[in-house]
Amino acid sequence: MLIKSITMRPGAHFHARPAADLAVLARQFESVLLISVGEELADAKNALALMRLPKPKDGSIELTASGPDEEEAAAALETQILTIERLRK
């Protein structure tokens, strides 16, 4: 099992498009991939679950990967998460 702490860009969160993109990427891996914001936990392969996560107050989230391709999966998801920008109105 691999656990990574990731700091998102200021104001960024899992709104519709980034959540969908991340879920599509996550489904390419066998590993179980979970993202937590505080006490809330979501399956990274489920866009709706990601969208339900609260906006991280300090931008900090935790990514947990467990499975045969956990290192590759965690690296790919971290890269994708770091590109998420805040939703412009």
Protein language model regions, located:
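Short amphipathic
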Residues: M1-P10
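Conserved beta-strand core positions
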Residues: K4, L33, G59-I61
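C-terminal structural segments of small proteins and small subunits
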Residues: R52-K89
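Amphipathic alpha-helical interaction surfaces in cytosolic regulatory modules
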Residues: A12-V32, L41-K57, A75
